């Protein structure tokens, strides 16, 4: 009887050991993949430069001041975090033909991050409020003066205007921080996206597109400035 109990205990300990080993092995493999990915894209260096650009920028305060005389729920401000956002972009096919747009680009973080890390043709931000737009333009000037980023900065541009009326015809990849977009604005934007023939991929936060032209293909959690939300990647249906 004692031998049976000892054998059973030994067996259970062995199973527990194998489970722990597999979990640790899986974690190590994941960390190795992340390290390889970061090294391949030179992310540590890009992240350091990105924080030099934006370390003294308070986009929330700039937005609050800009919205004093014009405010609505869709103007509530939020920002990307560099590494989580670049990881999100790695889930879509970005190449030298990609024209990236950020609708509601604020101080330009998503636009700058995209152009710094990926070989896009263009990286463009559209912002409604002049104060935020001006800040983004200043970050671009600062980036252009940094060693190794002259060519990347040439791909970046910022447009002061309403994303419901600005020309989006060349966009192939669009990012929308859509967490606070509702009602007529959200419906109008979905209608616009449907009419863009070059557009192949749309990334939204917190909710999916309400469109028959785009199919949801991936859902992932992403760290944003206000917390963790779901990001949704949509592809145009053929």
Regions found by a protein language model. Name each.
Residues 129:
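Conserved SAM/SAH-binding beta-strand->alpha-helix loop
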Residues 108-112:
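Glycine-rich SAM-binding Motif I of class I
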Residues 97-106:
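Conserved class I S-adenosyl-L-methionine
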Residues 172-184:
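A short SAM/SAH-binding and catalytic strip from SAM-dependent methyltransferases
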Residues 116-122:
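Conserved S-adenosyl-L-methionine
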Residues 181-238:
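C-terminal substrate-binding/active-site "lid" region of AdoMet-derived donor-dependent transferases
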Residues 5-96, 133-168:
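S-adenosyl-L-methionine
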